[in-house]
Amino acid sequence: MIGNTLFDRRMLEALVCPVTQAGLAYDADRQELISKQARLAFPIRDGIPIMLVSEAREL
């Protein structure tokens, strides 16, 4: 949780990796969406996933 805002896990059904179009995994501890195929972790800030490759962390 960041502040008082939680990520809505139902969003995972609609979101895909912008690089591979594959599904994403949610890492609640790090507040990231993980693309295993692209080996990228997209941050979640204030409950909003930031799906920009330039903002992603390499795994």
Curated annotation (Swiss-Prot):
One cellular component term from this protein's GO annotations in UniProt: cytosol
Family: Belongs to the UPF0434 family.
InterPro entries tied to this protein: Trm112-like
Organism: Cereibacter sphaeroides (strain ATCC 17029 / ATH 2.4.9) (Rhodobacter sphaeroides)
Domain of life, per lineage: Bacteria
Gene3D superfamilies in the record: 2.20.25.10
Protein name per UniProt: UPF0434 protein Rsph17029_0141
Coiled coil: none
PANTHER family linked to this entry: PROTEIN PREY, MITOCHONDRIAL (PTHR33505:SF4), ZGC:162634 (PTHR33505)
